[in-house]
C-alpha cells in the first residue's frame, strides 16, 4: 500500500515537472519569436558610422563601392534584365516582387519593420546580417553572442542560397567558400 502511494506521488511529481518544462519551453519560444519580429531595419548609413573606420578596414566603402550586392537593385534595370523580363511577360523587373525579394533588402523586409531603410540600398548590410535595431550598439557588437541574440545573422551557405540558387534566371554555379572570399569585409577590431 505504501509503495503504491510513493509510486503515485513520483508519477504526479514527474508529470508536473514535465508540464512546467513544456510551459517554460513554449514561453521561451514565443518570447524569442516575438522579439525577432521586433528587430527593425535601420539602414546602411547607421552601419557606416562604425564600419567605415580605417581600423576596421573601411568595410562600408568596400561594400558600397566594390560589392555587387549594393548594386543588386540597379542590375534589374540592366539591358540583360530588361530583355529577360520582356521575354517572360514581366513588365518591369525592378518592380517585380519575385526579383525584388533578392535584389532589395527594402522589399524583402516586412513592411512594418523597414522604415529605417531606403529602396535604393540594393542588398544592404541588413540583407545579409539581419535587421540591426537591437544589435547596433558598440557594447552589444563587442560580444558576438549578445549581437546574435539582438538579431545579428551569421553568414552561412544556407543564408546565401536563399537567393543564389537556380530560381534566379541568371544563376551561375555558387561556391560558398570561393564566393564568400570575394565579398568578405573582415572586421579587424575583433568585434562580432
Predicted regions mapped to residue ranges:
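Functional cores that coordinate and move charged inorganic groups
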Residues: 167-168
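Bacterial N-terminal signal peptides that target proteins for export
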Residues: 6-25
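Alpha-helical transmembrane segments
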Residues: 25-28, 129
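Cys/His-rich zinc-coordinating modules
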Residues: 158
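Sequence context of c-type cytochrome heme-c attachment sites
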Residues: 36-121, 126, 132-155, 173-192
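N-terminal signal peptide c-region/cleavage motif recognized by signal peptidases
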Residues: 31-33
Amino acid at each position: 500500500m505504501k509503495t503504491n502511494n510513493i509510486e503515485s506521488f513520483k508519477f504526479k511529481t514527474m508529470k508536473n515537472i514535465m508540464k512546467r518544462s513544456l510551459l517554460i519551453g513554449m514561453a521561451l519560444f514565443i518570447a524569442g519569436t516575438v522579439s525577432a519580429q521586433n528587430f527593425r531595419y535601420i539602414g546602411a548609413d547607421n552601419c557606416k558610422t562604425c564600419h567605415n573606420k580605417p581600423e576596421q578596414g573601411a568595410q562600408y566603402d568596400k561594400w558600397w563601392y566594390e560589392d555587387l550586392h549594393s548594386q543588386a537593385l540597379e542590375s534589374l534595370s540592366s539591358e540583360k534584365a530588361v530583355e529577360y523580363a520582356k521575354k517572360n511577360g514581366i513588365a518591369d523587373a525592378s518592380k517585380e516582387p519575385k526579383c525584388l525579394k533578392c535584389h532589395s533588402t527594402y522589399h524583402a523586409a516586412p513592411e512594418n519593420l523597414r522604415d529605417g531603410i531606403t529602396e535604393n540600398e540594393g542588398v544592404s548590410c541588413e540583407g545579409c546580417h539581419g535587421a540591426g535595431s537591437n544589435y547596433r550598439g558598440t557594447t552589444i557588437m563587442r560580444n558576438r553572442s549578445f549581437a546574435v541574440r539582438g538579431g545579428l545573422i551569421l553568414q552561412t551557405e544556407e543564408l546565401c542560397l536563399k537567393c543564389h540558387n537556380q530560381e534566379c534566371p541568371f544563376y551561375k554555379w555558387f561556391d560558398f567558400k570561393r564566393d564568400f572570399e570575394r565579398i568578405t569585409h573582415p572586421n579587424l577590431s575583433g568585434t562580432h
